[in-house]
Amino acid sequence: MSNRVIIFDTTLRDGEQALAASLSVKEKLQIAMALERLGVDVMEVGFPVSSPGDFESVQTIARTIKNSRVCALSRALEKDIDAAAQALSVADQFRIHTFISTSTIHVESKLKRSFDQVLEMAVSAVKYARRFTDDVEFSCEDAGRTPIENLCRMVEAAILAGARTINIPDTVGYTVPSEFGNIIQTLFNRVPNIDQAVISVHCHDDLGLSVANSITAVQHGARQIECTINGIGERAGNCSLEEIAMILATRKGMLGLETGINAKEIHRTSNLVSQLCNMPVQANKAIVGANAFTHSSGIHQDGMLKAQNTYEIMTPESIGLNRNNLNMTSRSGRHVIKHRMEEMGYSEHDYNMDALYEEFLKLADKKGQVFDYDLEALAFMEAQAEEDNHYQLQQLVVQSDSTEGVATATVRIEVGGEIKTEAATGNGPVDAAYNAIARATDRRIDIISYKLGAKGVGQNALGQVDITAVYHEQNFHGVGLATDVVEASARALVHVMNLTCRADKVADYKQSMQKNRELGGV
């Protein structure tokens, strides 16, 4: 048996079912091209019979993708299979995936047929699909709750009819790993023609076991895993592609299995899917979460600086990230602060480590995470332990034209003790407010990240805006809180403005310090 596991991605079919709004054809094509770069073997990209839009997107992707096999879903009905075949006909290589329910509850309650009738429908569907391609996949929907005798009969009949891949879905995420592994093992033991097909699994995450069930399945002989980027999908989601890929890569010595996934594309693909689908990845998500390679514990940080593999079983570079993160918090030790200062180019002779660490702990207790620009200010400007408020927002008035989409904002800002009033227009109220603030402060920065959230619950909740901005090639993080989202956005920008102002003062101090050194050395 081959040790190669086929990765079947269904982000654009099963994954899209979780979205509040469907993706456009262009967005689907973007994701499909990312999946091709990632190296998925098969991508299931839609259900052509369901709508003209789905048909168009499947056809467009099928025409474009060259290095992955493009697949479309169909029920065990000739009209579905016809639509799938027509949409896929422009592809270099394609697969038709047909399915029917096999569990007792589905057969009796949903299909209202006998199992024998359902078996005949499955056989007919597979045979019909074989008219269009040799690559036919058949799925036993709700296989996890199907009596094993019936499941064995269905699998044997589908293979005999011409299916080259047999998919065993845990459709409702009901099974546990030992149980699911036993199902796969029983199929290999009882189905006489099992060697004529690839056994696939498609596990849902209702009990949080989709990845564990999938790994157990390949340990028992399955050689295709159906999964999605970021684990998105119906209800609680699907098996996560990135987790499967990195489990098989990281534990290759133990599992003896491999995939064709280009792991360095994982982070990039995850971000793209998250953005286009408007589904943020939770911070503690395995592999691709913001905290996946972030270390806050002082003990962990110290270990990481001594040897990276003390607390990391894979590198961030392996999934396409540049580096891991050592968050500077009140739990960070002196070693971490010294290391960070060294990374920024400072030697211990440039600052007082004892004083810096004492001030660092005070600031960390107050604000939580401390950033590089905070550390520089603490090291070189004793009077700047508290954040400067060179800019203070006094008033913000916004007027919007709902028909034209143009907004006008007027701001009154205190700038170093002087009151300035400026007005500006923009593409929406936030853009207008930002333009007015930029005029008043005469300071231009580039916003690279804008996140809108809420602090509190119900009617008492405040809008919270978090922004990341670039100023002189350095990132600055600002937060704004207000009952109004536009005001919260403005306050976040003013927060960043104050941070950049302080950074300028630090830069001036460092420059004068360098000049003094040069003069002293003459």
UniProtKB/Swiss-Prot annotation:
**Residues spanning the signal sequence:** none
Q: Which residues bind Mn(2+)?
A: D14, H202, H204, N238
The Gene Ontology CC terms held by the record are:
cytosol
Q: Enumerate the cofactors the protein uses.
A: Mn(2+)
User: Its Gene Ontology biological processes?
Assistant: L-leucine biosynthetic process
What residue spans carry the region label Regulatory domain?
A: 392-522
Q: Which keywords describe this protein according to UniProt?
A: Amino-acid biosynthesis, Branched-chain amino acid biosynthesis, Cytoplasm, Leucine biosynthesis, Manganese, Metal-binding, Transferase
Enzyme Commission number: 2.3.3.13
Pathway terms, separated by semicolons: Amino-acid biosynthesis; L-leucine biosynthesis; L-leucine from 3-methyl-2-oxobutanoate: step 1/4
Ranges for domain Pyruvate carboxyltransferase come to 5-267
Q: Which PANTHER family match?
A: 2-ISOPROPYLMALATE SYNTHASE 1, CHLOROPLASTIC-RELATED, HOMOCITRATE SYNTHASE-RELATED
Q: Write out the similarity annotation.
A: Belongs to the alpha-IPM synthase/homocitrate synthase family. LeuA type 1 subfamily.
Q: How does this protein assemble?
A: Homodimer.
What protein name applies here? Answer: 2-isopropylmalate synthase
Origin organism of this chain? Shewanella baltica (strain OS195)
Q: What is the lineage of its organism?
A: Bacteria, Pseudomonadati, Pseudomonadota, Gammaproteobacteria, Alteromonadales
Q: Which gene encodes it?
A: leuA
